[in-house]
Regions:
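Short, surface-exposed charged micro-motifs
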Residues: 252, 318-320
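Conserved N-proximal alpha/beta basic substrate-recognition cap immediately N-terminal to
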Residues: 9-23, 28-154
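C-terminal active-site "lid" helix and adjoining low-complexity regulatory extension at the edge
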Residues: 276-314, 321-361
Length: 361
């Protein structure tokens, strides 16, 4: 029987959901905590789970304070991160956390290369690339795929203003290496000035992530922009959402082996549609019926091509349709974009089973 090793944070929803699914399709995964992989810099020499042939899946390292500290230490080993307060939700040097994660992923790549008996479901360097929104957009644009206009690294490093109504009157600013809409700021220019919709909360000198989408203006908005700029920002032209069921809509396309296997409509009254931020899954058939088949197939083709830009079995591709559905853009590609409890294909398989069947085929 094929062995499965899961690098994850035990006890988190993602880890538990995957383990339950694996047991259901007849595989008992061996869970190796990120807390054991990160301090070793991705070196697997002392981790016996990797000595024998196995499929290796990496799960998100999020939702674990101890792991956050380890990532910070991997990014800056000269600071005693254990003594630094880390209240729940606080965005503590997210750019540095990413630097630490990249170093670990680089180490994992070397470890996998030295162990041909292991079959990682994603190249660690592809995971790092997908987490870098600016790099991802550049890759997608180079592949000829439709994306929002965005500021180049040269513009971000220069004196180009991040918000300029003469450039874009609707502008999205995101933590360049964030996930799940952490550090998201959607701005629109009004006669009274810029108004932002955000998941960032600034209080007592600290910036936190909040699940309560809120509106910011004036000095509060400026502080959020300054925070994003310090930590590494992706700045995109805001694209108007197509409306479904009277709400803003976009689409998550989960690709397995470069092929779309799941499409989830996300609807929200806000410009930020993530399901954990008040968005909801749209009724699939009703939403699908609203989109002419030609434009639907065009979007799926773009999602497939976007996933194909990265060496990963699984990619969650975010696609936005403009009003009328004739035009679409690829917004992001998510390395860990397959967590949709309750989804099933016509054969009754959940996403994890679909992925495992692809591995075994």
């Amino acid at each position: 029987m094929t062995r499965l090793v899961l690098i994850a944070n035990p006890g988190t929803k993602r880890c538990e959901a995957y383990c339950r699914a694996a047991v259901a399709f007849g595989v008992m995964p061996v869970v190796v905590p990120w807390a054991e992989v990160i301090p070793a810099g991705g070196c697997l020499d002392r981790l016996g789970a990797f000595d024998e042939p196995a499929v290796v899946r990496m799960e998100s390292p999020g939702k674990d304070t101890a792991v956050t500290r380890l990532l910070l230490a991997a990014g800056d080993p000269h600071t005693d991160w254990q003594s630094v307060p880390l209240p729940k939700g606080v965005l503590l040097h997210p750019g540095l956390q990413y630097q630490g994660f990249v170093r670990v992923l680089q180490g994992l790549r070397k470890s996998f290369d030295a162990r041909p008996h292991l079959r990682p479901t994603a190249c660690p360097l592809a995971v790092a690339r997908m987490f870098d929104k600016n790099a991802t957009l550049a890759d997608l644009r180079a592949a000829g795929l439709p994306t929002p206009d965005f500021l180049s690294p040269e513009q971000l490093a220069g004196s180009t203003p991040l918000l300029d109504p003469d450039r874009w009157r609707v502008t999205y600013l995101k933590l360049n290496t964030g996930a799940s809409a952490v550090g998201m700021l959607a701005c629109r220019h009004t006669p009274a000035g810029w108004v932002g919709t955000t998941t960032i909360l600034h209080r007592d000198g600290e910036f936190s992530n909040t699940r309560r989408v809120r509106t910011v203006t004036g000095a509060d908005l400026s502080e959020c922009v300054a925070f994003l700029s310090r930590e590494g920002v992706c700045v995109q032209k805001g694209i108007p959402h197509a409306q479904l069921d009277g709400q803003n809509a976009d689409l998550r396309v989960v690709c397995v082996g470069g092929k779309p296997v799941a499409t989830i409509f996300r609807l929200s009254q806000h410009p930020i549609t993530n399901l954990h931020l008040g968005g909801r899954r749209g009724d699939w058939q009703r939403c699908r019926d609203a989109i002419p088949t030609r434009y639907w197939l065009d979007a799926l083709e773009s999602a497939s091509a976007a996933a194909g830009c990265f060496d990963s079995l699984v990619a969650g591709v975010d696609v936005i349709f403009e009003p009328g559905f004739r035009r679409h853009s690829v917004l992001e590609v998510n390395a860990f974009g397959d967590f949709f409890p309750g989804w099933a294909d016509p054969a009754g398989r959940d996403l994890y089973r679909v992925e495992w069947d692809a591995i075994m085929s």
